[in-house]
């Protein structure tokens, strides 16, 4: 079945139109123009925000009262080797198993289509709804994420924009649509560590200082350290070394320097400052000549049970009969930026089994369920 098939539902038709636009990050490939046309027709005021090379937009419909925002991204990751795909990644085909195939089908153009169609239907059914509905869309989520949601949120906060609730369309489900929702994320703190030694000949180790030998005990202690116990919402903080580089490429030269990249995924039981101090104390304990450059990608955030989480859970239950399991596992998302506005944030999207993979796909019928879940959530919060 192709994207032009007359038998496609409004959600699948729009999802296919979006997938057929090759919006490899940070490109948008006119996905947002398509979405904005639909939202403008539904009575939204539009505010495109191009920041550096990134396309973003903010759209809002309604008056005073609580604001429910739908957030997401139009950019996708690169395809990988085209010959490995069963169907071309931007053809947007539905196979004989009922799977919508294509880059972005799960992450996250399927969610975007479900959001738009759900909102169109809600506005038609409830033209005088309470509060306001908003959209915050970027083309810089899969890339550096400097000029996307983060920058838009800064502008919105500076002018006092209100955001009470936000649904981010990230693919949160694991096996069945709606089985898991993300009600928070761990923080991410990365670092580049440099250990300085003295280069020399391997036959004369007394004239050199081997930074590999010097660093090994400290790295082992960092890897074994118990950082915290986590809590009811978050697992314990984890520390992982992701890169280790040293040496000249020669077997007879003791290197003069070692660099290590490492990352913390941390819970609300730890702070950035606390983790940094503990790392630096361990490095000092081992008498190392060290330098570290820290990079904070995001702080942990948590949406506890309340209006948004209750409405989402009730909608999933009504549509699928499932009890959604709240989770804070996985990587970071743009929800970390939106949460800084004091917003209740929940991530809800399709099954994530094939995201970023060759042959990315999502069950077409799941997008219909997702559309209905979004619609029912709108009804519960704003009808």
From Swiss-Prot:
Record keywords: Amino-acid biosynthesis, Cobalt, Diaminopimelate biosynthesis, Hydrolase, Lysine biosynthesis, Metal-binding, Zinc
Pathway info: Amino-acid biosynthesis; L-lysine biosynthesis via DAP pathway; LL-2,6-diaminopimelate from (S)-tetrahydrodipicolinate (succinylase route): step 3/3
Biological processes annotated in GO: diaminopimelate biosynthetic process; L-arginine biosynthetic process; lysine biosynthetic process via diaminopimelate
GO MF entries: acetylornithine deacetylase activity; cobalt ion binding; succinyl-diaminopimelate desuccinylase activity; zinc ion binding
Active-site residues, record numbering mapped to chain: 75, 141 (proton acceptor)
UniProt xrefs under InterPro entries: ArgE/DapE_CS, Bact_exopeptidase_dim_dom, DapE_proteobac, Peptidase_M20, Peptidase_M20_dimer, Peptidase_M20A
Coiled-coil annotated spans: none
Reaction catalyzed: N-succinyl-(2S,6S)-2,6-diaminopimelate + H2O = (2S,6S)-2,6-diaminopimelate + succinate
Subunit comment: Homodimer.
Main function: Catalyzes the hydrolysis of N-succinyl-L,L-diaminopimelic acid (SDAP), forming succinate and LL-2,6-diaminopimelate (DAP), an intermediate involved in the bacterial biosynthesis of lysine and meso-diaminopimelic acid, an essential component of bacterial cell walls.
Record's protein name: Succinyl-diaminopimelate desuccinylase
Organism encoding this protein: Pseudomonas aeruginosa (strain UCBPP-PA14)
